[in-house]
């Protein structure tokens, strides 16, 4: 999930770099030209638009997935792959916000920095946002690649603190209210949510099991995942042309010579 940005911090710089390379190679750019079909006749590819036919010895398909259709993605690249009898794996939403039943209604609008959201062996430490439907922000988007719905995720509000350290912290602040003690660790509304009806009690008044429960919530709140947003509302399509059928060095199809996917 590493990201690289141009020095200008502007997407236009990337576009210009691609355009410059295309011009350097003597190629043409056709805009407002929708490809309607692709086939191979003898040893050449035929690419048809509504009013033109283009032929080439090689074909590179870079149509993107089926997510984020406002960018022009329709999944047509998968249709091309299927036409050439290539295997297309199941398509799923990835880099998608997560839908939950709990606790987003109580915490809606709260953003958290550098928390750890995990499911099984997958642990993502990044920023997180509670929304009216569930979870968003980088941590949720990245975890979405590993869930479908029906899983239990765990949220660690304080990944840099151990449970033992937190026990010591509460003991050192035993004369303070539970809410104020928690407020020094997490946003106020999260503190109120975790303290429940003991917000105004002093830490020393908590039963051992109540304190243990608060610390457990801080280190691993259970969040049932009910699903994720549709492909149309996701940033990335998980799945596509089976990589077993693609040469990793050239991105060429192993079944169809000179057909590349990128």
PLM features: what roles do these ranges have?
Residues 29-33, 49, 90-92:
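Short loop/edge segments at beta-strand edges and connector loops
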Residues 1-5, 26, 85-95:
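A short alpha-helix-loop-beta-strand transition element characteristic
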Residues 86-90, 96-209:
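An anion/pyrophosphate-binding glycine-rich loop and adjacent beta-alpha core
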Residues 7-15, 94-103, 227-245:
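Flavin (FAD/FMN) cofactor-binding core of flavoprotein oxidoreductases
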Residues 31, 192-262:
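A glycine-rich dinucleotide-binding beta-alpha-beta segment and adjacent secondary-structure elements
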Residues 35, 54-73, 81-82, 128-133, ...:
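Short hydrophobic core segments
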Residues 1-28, 33:
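Conserved N-terminal/central alpha/beta ligand/cofactor-binding core
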Residues 31-44:
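A conserved short coil-to-beta-strand element within the FAD-binding core of flavoproteins
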């Amino acid at each position: 999930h590493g990201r690289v940005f141009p020095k200008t911090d502007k997407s236009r710089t990337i576009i210009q770099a691609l355009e410059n390379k295309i011009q350097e190679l003597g190629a043409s750019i056709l805009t407002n030209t929708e490809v309607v079909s692709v086939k191979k006749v003898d040893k050449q590819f035929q690419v048809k638009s509504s009013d033109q036919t283009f032929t080439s010895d090689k074909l590179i398909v870079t149509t993107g997935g089926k997510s984020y259709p406002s960018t022009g993605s329709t999944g047509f690249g998968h249709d091309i792959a299927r036409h050439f009898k290539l295997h297309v794996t199941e398509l799923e939403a990835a880099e998608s916000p997560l839908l939950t039943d709990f606790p987003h209604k109580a915490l809606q609008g709260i953003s958290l920095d550098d928390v750890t959201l995990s499911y099984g062996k997958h642990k993502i430490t990044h920023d997180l946002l509670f929304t009216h439907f569930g979870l968003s922000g980088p941590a949720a988007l990245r975890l979405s690649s590993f869930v479908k719905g029906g899983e239990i995720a765990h949220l660690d509000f304080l990944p840099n603190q151990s449970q033992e350290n937190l026990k010591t912290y509460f003991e050192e602040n035993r004369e303070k209210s539970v809410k104020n003690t928690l407020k020094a660790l997490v946003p106020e509304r999260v503190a109120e949510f975790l303290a429940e009806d003991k917000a105004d009690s002093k830490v020393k008044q908590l039963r051992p099991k109540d304190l243990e429960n608060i610390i457990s919530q801080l280190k691993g709140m259970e969040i049932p995942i009910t699903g994720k947003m549709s492909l149309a509302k996701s940033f990335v399509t998980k799945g596509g042309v089976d990589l077993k059928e693609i040469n990793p060095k050239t991105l060429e199809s192993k079944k169809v010579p000179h057909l590349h996917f990128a």
